[in-house]
């Protein structure tokens, strides 16, 4: 059944032939001037038009269009086809694909060749690539030689004609490519959270790492404030560095040196006057548990006991099991006005403490003022009483 009029096509007709069907049932018939099964492929020299002008010249087609077209030589004595068309040119991509017959193993022969081309606007080699694609089908060598026995008069040109007929399928590739999926910012920040957690490992960040942490937190929108970040970073760094405060549970050693010990004297005296004996022992154990603090209290309390009450100093030294020599009288030699023997003028305890030479590292370091001396005197009495109770 041959339909010469495309308007006579039955309802629901769709033209989607395979490569083999295009060559065997359409191109071969057109080259032999035989009627095609359906006359829906027009004879158009596609190299005289731009591809976007061809849909208006076809007989049938919606998204792809089929044409029978001749091919001319690029050079008179060459075999290369002329690919110039309209305002641009067609450029071949890839290699030729042979089309084989599916009639069985005995008849599995090559019936044609398929070539893919892309249209470029402009002149080679600086053309602009477009989305117009063409699949060109041509007959195999034996069929092409047999088809050349008859040539239509309007396309007959023995000098430049390469092929009388080739079948071209032209379509436009969709330019709406799916955009690449960009991951959200939170996915990048999950590996390096900027918020400080209570159970997070402690570390001392450098200035560069702290700055990067602040920037990451600000980008993620999870950073509360710069002040809180600076405080958290400083607190984390202080927890990492060991200090003397680790030696004392309740009172930091730095408090003993601030403002001459006045700030530390009040809590020390309050602890010395604590009526609860059990609670008082726990506080003193936390304060005097370290040998450095015991050495400091012993040096300062023995000196003050010697100045205030020699009997108390002797009793304290006896109970502690150590012999403490009475300190030398500290003062200045002053000659009397009558020419008699020089006399020694005693200095106040604070002046004597200030004049104390740096003979002992501990004694020279822990001179913290009269307020601390008074508190250390009371604490030394408590320590001596507890030591006597332990010995009894």
Curated annotation (Swiss-Prot):
The UniProt entry, under InterPro entries, shows: NAC-dom, NAC_dom_sf
Which is a Pfam family this sequence falls into?
A: NAM
List, in alphabetical order, the Gene Ontology terms for molecular function in this entry: DNA binding
For region Disordered, the annotated ranges are 317-345
**Protein purpose:** Transcription factor that acts as a positive regulator of the jasmonate (JA) pathway to mediate leaf senescence. May directly regulate LOX2, AOC, AOS2, AOC1 and OPR7, which are genes involved in the biosynthesis of JA. Regulates positively leaf senescence by directly targeting senescence-associated genes (SAGs) related to chlorophyll degradation, nutrient transport and other genes associated with abscisic acid-induced leaf senescence. Transcription activator that plays a role in mediating abiotic stress responses through the abscisic acid (ABA) pathway.
Q: In which tissues is it expressed?
A: Expressed in leaves, nodes, internodes and mature seeds. Highly expressed in roots. Expressed in leaf sheaths, flag leaves and inflorescences. Expressed in primary and lateral roots, particularly in the vascular tissues. Expressed in the primary phloem of the culm and leaf sheaths. Expressed principally in the primary phloem and in the peripheral zone of the leaf vascular bundles. Expressed in the floral tissues.
Q: Any one Gene Ontology biological process term?
A: regulation of DNA-templated transcription
**Where, per UniProt, does this protein localize?**
Nucleus
Which species is this UniProt entry from? Oryza sativa subsp. japonica
Give the record's keywords alphabetically: Abscisic acid signaling pathway, DNA-binding, Jasmonic acid signaling pathway, Nucleus, Transcription, Transcription regulation
Q: Which GO terms describe its cellular component?
A: nucleus
**Carries keyword Cell inner membrane?**
no
The protein, known as: NAC domain-containing protein 58
Q: What else is known?
A: Plants overexpressing NAC58 display an accelerated leaf senescence phenotype at the grain-filling stage. The gain-of-function mutant plants ps1-D (T-DNA activation tagging) exhibit premature leaf senescence phenotype. Plants silencing NAC58 exhibit delayed leaf senescence and an extended grain-filling period, resulting in significant increase in the grain yield. Plants overexpressing NAC58 exhibit a significantly reduced rate of water loss, enhanced tolerance to high salinity, drought and low temperature at the vegetative stage, and improved yield under drought stress at the flowering stage.
**Domain of life of the organism encoding this protein:** Eukaryota
Q: Start and end of every NAC domain?
A: 9-173
Factors inducing expression? Up-regulated during leaf senescence. Induced by treatment with methyl jasmonate (MeJa). Induced by salt stress, cold stress, osmotic stress and treatment with hydrogen peroxide. Induced by treatment with abscisic acid (ABA).
| Statement: the UniProt record of this protein carries the keyword Translocase | no
Query: Can you quote the domain comment?
Result: The NAC domain includes a DNA binding domain and a dimerization domain.
Q: Which SUPFAM superfamilies match?
A: NAC domain
């Amino acid at each position: 059944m041959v339909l010469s009029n495309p308007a006579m096509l039955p309802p629901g007709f769709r033209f989607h032939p395979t490569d083999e069907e295009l060559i065997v049932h359409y191109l071969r018939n057109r080259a032999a001037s035989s009627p095609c099964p359906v006359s829906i492929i027009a004879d158009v020299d596609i190299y005289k038009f731009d591809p976007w002008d061809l849909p208006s010249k076809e007989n049938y087609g919606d998204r792809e269009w089929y044409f029978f077209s001749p091919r001319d030589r690029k050079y008179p004595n060459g075999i290369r086809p002329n690919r110039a068309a309209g305002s641009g040119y067609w450029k071949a991509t890839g290699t030729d694909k042979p089309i084989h017959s599916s009639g069985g193993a005995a008849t599995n022969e090559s019936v044609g060749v398929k070539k893919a081309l892309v249209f470029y606007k402009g002149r080679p080699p600086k053309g602009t690539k477009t989305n117009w694609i063409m699949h060109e089908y041509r007959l195999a060598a034996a069929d092409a030689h047999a088809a050349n026995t008859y040539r239509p008069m309007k396309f007959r040109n023995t000098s430049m004609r390469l092929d009388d007929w080739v079948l071209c399928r032209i379509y436009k590739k969709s330019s709406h490519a799916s955009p690449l999926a960009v991951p959200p910012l939170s996915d990048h920040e999950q590996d390096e959270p900027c918020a400080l957690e209570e159970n997070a490992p402690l570390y001392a960040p450098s200035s560069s790492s702290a700055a990067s942490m602040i920037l990451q937190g600000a980008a993620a929108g999870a950073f509360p404030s710069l002040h809180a970040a600076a405080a958290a970073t400083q607190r984390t760094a202080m927890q990492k560095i060991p200090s003397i405060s680790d030696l004392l549970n309740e009172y930091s050693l730095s408090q003993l040196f601030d403002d001459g010990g006045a700030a530390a004297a009040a809590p020390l005296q309050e602890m010395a006057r604590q009526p609860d004996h059990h609670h008082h022992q726990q506080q003193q154990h936390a304060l005097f548990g370290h040998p450095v603090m015991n050495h400091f209290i012993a040096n300062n309390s023995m000196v003050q006991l010697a100045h205030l009450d020699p009997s108390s100093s002797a009793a304290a030294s006896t109970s502690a099991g150590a012999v403490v020599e009475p300190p030398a009288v500290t003062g200045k030699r002053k000659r009397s006005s009558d020419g008699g023997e020089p006399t020694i003028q005693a200095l106040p305890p604070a002046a004597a403490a200030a004049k104390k030479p740096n003979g002992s590292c501990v004694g020279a370091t822990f001179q913290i003022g009269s307020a601390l001396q008074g508190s250390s005197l009371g604490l030394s009495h408590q320590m001596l009483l507890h030591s006597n109770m332990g010995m009894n």
